[in-house]
From Swiss-Prot:
Heme binds at residue 414. Coiled coil: none annotated. Belongs to the cytochrome P450 family. A cytochrome P450 monooxygenase involved in neural cholesterol clearance through bile acid synthesis. Catalyzes 7-alpha hydroxylation of (24S)-hydroxycholesterol, a neural oxysterol that is metabolized to bile acids in the liver. Mechanistically, uses molecular oxygen inserting one oxygen atom into a substrate, and reducing the second into a water molecule, with two electrons provided by NADPH via cytochrome P450 reductase (CPR; NADPH-ferrihemoprotein reductase). The gene is CYP39A1. This is 24-hydroxycholesterol 7-alpha-hydroxylase. It is found in: Endoplasmic reticulum membrane; Microsome membrane. It holds the Pfam family p450. Changing residue 324 to K: Correlated with elevated serum (24S)-hydroxycholesterol levels; impairs 7-alpha hydroxylase activity.
């Protein structure tokens, strides 16, 4: 018995050490999982996901996992987790979004993975800073044309005003003029279907289409629209230099590498990416500017010094003009900081350690630009609209402020970010040059219902405009 006891003790000791090491290696962040199988805390999370994330951070600390709708989402909020999110080779962007792309645009996963990098390189080249000068002239012309439709004066919801300007401008520039009808009934249809598709995009990315009848109908409407118009879009060439529009270049890659059957689906995905964020950014920027009289006055003085005081002329906006109106660019960037997307995501492909926790493969690693931009450590007085903070950004070298993540970061940042900034800047310049504008309602609260993209306003915000004389 005396000989057995030491042996048993050694075995038990080794077993205890092994279990201790295993426990250490498998130590995971606190998990909020609820009690309903598969759904988890999906109902609570879905009611107000942005608020849910912040409350969880306060309660559980800088890293925590949320189990909802069959997904484990691990949120990181401090430097170490952010660095892993941005730099680790153990996390992957494409695998994180492939299901979303499949559900919202019906693009097969194998097709998406095969084409994504090629399309990204094309988009980045075509929409990059080197080529921005090619867009300024047409942007100006398209915006002038749509501003004419507003008349000399009026009152309308600011969000609708921006939609009526930017929907046709963006489609005409990046897709083809034939896609956006001039027929009032069809224009109304386009607006209605896109708003439904956009507003429920997040639900469409997670739930079966049979539960989202109106969203599914809108999706099918756009797929049919592209299927009908793609032959004409492909046949149309630029009268100036025979160059291709963004959609034409996309279709060229899609049909060369796969099949023309996927073309309408990529048309829909590109349409959503082009319109879903530009419109709310322009809305919020105008709303912030018009609700800050000192900033509004400074911008108007800048516009008058560059273009003169009258608002009747169809001015042309050059790159030099934009440089002389930097305050407007700062306002756009400050708006994007305050109204950043709720989350960006990566998929964990190999277990990764963050703050002594092990995040297992299969988890979705989540970072919230919305809350990161409200951390006073990175942005002092984070809730205030302070465009002047952007003086510190090296915008000449196309660099943002540290920890500004609205366009993502790393290998797959938004490839059209500089075009989007240009479009919103020019939209604001031309509106404020042509019209005296004032808000009839207070700045609305934002909706906390969605995590994807720039948040929408919760209520209406009417604008009164009158042509400057």
């Amino acid at each position: 018995m005396e000989l057995i006891s030491p042996t048993v003790i050694i075995i038990l000791g080794c077993l205890a050490l092994f279990l201790l090491l295993q426990r250490k290696n498998l130590r995971r962040p606190p998990c909020i999982k609820g009690w309903i199988p598969w759904i988890g805390v999906g109902f609570e999370f879905g009611k107000a996901p942005l608020e849910f994330i912040e409350k969880a951070r306060i309660k559980y600390g800088p890293i925590f996992t949320v189990f909802a709708m069959g997904n484990r989402m691990t949120f990181v909020t401090e430097e170490e987790g952010i660095n892993v999110f941005l730099k680790s080779k153990k996390v992957d962007f494409e695998l994180a979004v492939q299901n979303i792309v499949y559900r919202t645009a019906s693009i097969p996963k194998n097709v998406f993975l095969a084409l994504h990098e090629k399309l990204y390189i094309m988009l980045k080249g075509k929409m990059g800073t080197v080529n921005l000068h090619q867009f300024t002239g047409q942007l100006t012309e398209e915006l002038h044309e749509q501003l004419e439709n507003l008349g000399t004066h009026g009152t309308m919801d600011l969000n609708n005003l921006v939609r009526h300007l930017l929907y046709p401008v963006t489609v005409n520039m990046l897709f083809n003029k034939s896609l956006f009808s001039t027929n009032k009934k069809k224009i109304k249809e386009f607006h209605q279907y896109f708003q439904v598709y956009d507003e429920d995009f997040e639900y469409g990315s997670q739930l079966p289409e049979c539960l989202l009848r109106n969203w599914s109908k809108s999706k099918k409407w756009f797929l049919e629209l592209f299927e009908k118009n793609i032959p004409d879009i492909k046949a149309c060439k630029s009268a100036k230099d025979n160059s291709m529009t963004l959609l034409q270049a996309t279709l060229d890659i899609v049909e060369t590498e796969t099949s023309k059957e996927n073309s309408p689906n990529y048309g829909l995905l590109l349409l959503w990416a082009s319109l879903s964020n530009a419109v709310p950014v322009a809305f919020w920027t105008l709303a912030y500017v018009l609700s800050h009289p000192d900033i509004h006055k400074a911008i108007m003085e800048g516009i008058s010094s560059v273009f003169g005081k009258a608002g009747k002329d169809k001015i042309k906006v050059s790159e030099d003009d934009l440089e002389n109106l930097l305050l407007i660019k700062w306002c756009v960037l400050e708006t994007i900081r305050l109204k950043a997307p709720g989350v960006i995501t990566r998929k964990v492909v190999k277990p990764v350690e963050i703050l002594n926790y092990i995040i297992p493969s299969g988890d979705l690693l989540m970072l919230s630009p919305f809350w990161l931009h409200r951390n006073p450590k990175y942005f002092p007085e984070p809730e205030l609209f302070k465009p002047e903070r952007w003086k510190k950004a090296n915008l000449e070298k196309h660099s943002f402020l540290d920890c500004f993540m609205a366009f993502g970061s790393g290998k797959f940042q938004c490839p059209a970010r500089w075009f989007a900034l240009l479009e919103v800047q020019m939209c604001i310049i031309l509106i404020l040059y042509k019209y005296d504008c004032s808000l009839l309602d207070p700045l609305p609260k934002q909706s906390y219902l969605h995590l994807v993209g720039v948040p929408q306003p919760e209520g209406q915000c009417r604008i009164e405009y009158k042509q400057r004389i």
